[in-house]
Each structure stands twice: as C-alpha cells, then as structure tokens.
C-alpha cells in the first residue's frame, strides 16, 4: 500500500471515529487522542494526518456528500429523460435520505456553529461545495457569477429544508419532500438567479441571457 493510500485510509478511519463521537458530543469536547484510540491509530499519527477535529468532521461530510451525489446520478440515469428541476429535487431529497441516520451529528454541528462562527463558515463552505457538485451532476457548469449565485441559492434552499428535515419523523421523509418542492418553487418566483431550475426542453436555454431573464434577475439569497 502506498503512503498516500495509507494516509487516505487513516483519514477515513479517523473521520468515521470522530463522526461517531459527534453523535453525543460537541465538537469542542472531542479529543483527537480519544478519536485515535477508537480508530486504532497511534495518537501521534492521528494528529499528523488529521490536523484538527474540524478537518475530520469536514472529511466525513465530504464523503457523505459524494455518496449522495453518486447514488443520485445512478437514479437519475435510470429515470431517463427528466427535467433539470426534477433532477435537483431528486438529488436534494436523496441527500437528506443519506443524512437521515446522522441527524444527531447535524444537530450537534448546528449548535456548535452558533457558538463558533469560524466553524459555521467552514460548514457553509462545505455545503456550498456539496451544492456545486450536485449542480454539476445535473448538468449545470456553475460558471461565472450567475453560476455561483445558483450554487448559493440552492444551498439556501437546502438550509431552509434542513430545519423541517430535522423534525421529520415520517418513514419516507414526505414532509421534507414537500418542503423541497415549496422552497424551490419560491426560489423560482424570486427570479432567475436559479435559472438552472428551468427545463431546457421547455425554454430557450439553461443560461438564457434574454432581456426577459435580465429583467427578472433577483437574489435567491
């Protein structure tokens, strides 16, 4: 096994161990030595590889987000010809399904982020990266300022829906799905910042630059 592979495997194990502790412990009370012991990795090596507990948490979030996107891609490809909006609904919904077993960790992170603005910014950046990856998966190149606005707009939708998801006890997360649809509809009504939600089969183009699009442009955030 190469050095890079060993480091990657160690990081995965440490991230999983930290994530498990996060279910019942605030991030600021998680100690790297305890995480290392749970992952069966020497403490010195754990400190060298991980850097910080926050880095381990972000690593685990990234792995879950990649899992959600890849699984959504497979589902979307099996579904055949569907609109970009439907793809986004499917991808957002599946992301909440992937995170469903980890609600305790998300609640801990939300509480910690309110106390620690630096952590909050790191988590916002992580969410932005996840939404950027998701939009690229559904066919948006997220290029330029308009693309970044769409990323932020969908990230805002995800944050708003998460408030409902955290208390959604339905087996199929039907309440969450309704909230996704409602929030996306509202975002569309706000303007063309989320032009990626427009179906290219029923509109001129996903990145329409017509005068109508310019006139309707707004801030989804």
Where are these regions (language model features)?
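C-terminal peripheral helix-coil segments that are non-catalytic and often amphipathic
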Residues: 167-221
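Amphipathic alpha-helical packing segments from all-alpha helical-bundle domains
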Residues: 117-140, 148-159, 178
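Helix-turn-helix
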Residues: 2, 13, 21-59, 63
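Short, leucine-enriched amphipathic alpha-helices that occur as contiguous helical runs
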Residues: 7, 11-19
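Amphipathic alpha-helical interaction segments
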Residues: 13, 34, 90, 108, ...
